[in-house]
Amino acid sequence: MAKHLFTSESVSEGHPDKIADQISDAVLDAILEQDPKARVACETYVKTGMVLVGGEITTSAWVDIEEITRNTVREIGYVHSDMGFDANSCAVLSAIGKQSPDINQGVDRTDPLEQGAGDQGLMFGYATNETDVLMPAPVTYAHRLVQRQAEVRKNGTLPWLRPDAKSQVTFQYDGGKIVGIDAVVLSTQHAEDIEQNVLHDAVMEEIIKPVLPAEWLNESTKYFINPTGRFVIGGPMGDCGLTGRKIIVDTYGGMARHGGGAFSGKDPSKVDRSAAYAARYVAKNIVAAGLADRCEIQVSYAIGVAEPTSIMVETFGTEKIATEQLTLLVREFFDLRPYGLIQMLDLLHPIYKETAAYGHFGREHFPWEKTDKAQLLRDAAGLK
């Protein structure tokens, strides 16, 4: 592969779409805490002065959706009308129904292992050895930039920052290996009274330099910090936000394919979410085992059917054993039936709100990031 550029972006927890994702997952977590078998599909819409929470939820739990919503917005940092949104005064509307009994009869089974998929669909998982967390570097560092923005905003280092922010990083590759960073974009909402030159210097020193490895930066690296020159109006006042609108930010930054299904607000019976997590787990273990440098897994399902309709392994010519053998190993060591993968990854816990900002993959404490099958795979493949 010749020289090329690759770009990924991320958005902060205060971005309108991410506010919506976090509210949806906060509702999911609150329900799972009381009722692990709940069926939840929770969608959120945010706009100036209002939040609408809707969807289909079947549960024995009772949760205070208004309180969950306000607490989530408050934790993000929207606590004053000067920011364009206020957790204490925004309207919170709820339009929740129950999951269709037609879906229930396809999912629920006497034998849990025969639990059917909650919908048809295709999901992808990916891993690459170009970073220590086995994730693509562009999206990894895009996430770290907006995470750092939130950190210096919340700890008072840069108190004039506001919650809404976006990042974008363009990496240079040569022969498939990273050789540098070509461009960095960081746009951050800020207080009215801050001078742009002060903002520019502070963002450079407190956000960009501490995050991006110096060996990848050079005199030709381009920096675009608030390139419009002003970003006072942000959050839900600047744009409306919806759950599920940042599916590439949530996954691999465009470096792997995507089946189209969003994650936030969905309980683990929805294979859009749980099977995408399982596919990441499979791909990461294959790469961690040294069986390939890059690995993409596709898995697909039919509604109401437990067994996947297909499993595909793609290794982009980096495999150390035949891909047919890799596929057999996946079938042998990973149970990708809906209930099997829920058990395998221990998914019936309130762990989802944290996933809803800064990416669902690449943070080691999530169960789908474990590499506990790597040695088993390596041994079974006959590699020393």
Curated annotation (Swiss-Prot):
Keyword terms: ATP-binding, Cytoplasm, Magnesium, Metal-binding, Nucleotide-binding, One-carbon metabolism, Potassium, Transferase
Which sequence ranges form a coiled-coil region, renumbered to this chain? Answer: none
Q: In which pathway does it act?
A: Amino-acid biosynthesis; S-adenosyl-L-methionine biosynthesis; S-adenosyl-L-methionine from L-methionine: step 1/1
Question: Which CDD domains does the UniProt record give?
Answer: S-AdoMet_synt (cd18079)
Localization, UniProt? Cytoplasm
Main location (coarse class) = cytoplasm
Q: How is the cofactor bound?
A: Binds 2 divalent ions per subunit.
Q: Which InterPro entries match?
A: ADOMET_SYNTHASE_CS (IPR022631), S-AdoMet_synt_C (IPR022630), S-AdoMet_synt_central (IPR022629), S-AdoMet_synt_N (IPR022628), S-AdoMet_synthetase (IPR002133), S-AdoMet_synthetase_sfam (IPR022636)
Quick one: which residues bind K(+)?
E43
Residues at which L-methionine binds:
E56, Q99, D239, K270
An example of a GO molecular function for this protein is: ATP binding
Summarize where Mg(2+) binds, as residue positions: D17
* Region named Flexible loop: 99-109
> What EC number(s) is this enzyme filed under?
2.5.1.6
What cellular component terms from Gene Ontology apply here? cytoplasm
Q: What does this protein do?
A: Catalyzes the formation of S-adenosylmethionine (AdoMet) from methionine and ATP. The overall synthetic reaction is composed of two sequential steps, AdoMet formation and the subsequent tripolyphosphate hydrolysis which occurs prior to release of AdoMet from the enzyme.
Q: Which HAMAP family match?
A: S_AdoMet_synth1
* Family per similarity comment: Belongs to the AdoMet synthase family.
Q: What is the name listed in the Swiss-Prot or TrEMBL entry for this protein?
A: S-adenosylmethionine synthase
Origin organism lineage: Bacteria, Pseudomonadati, Pseudomonadota, Gammaproteobacteria, Enterobacterales
Write the gene name. Answer: metK
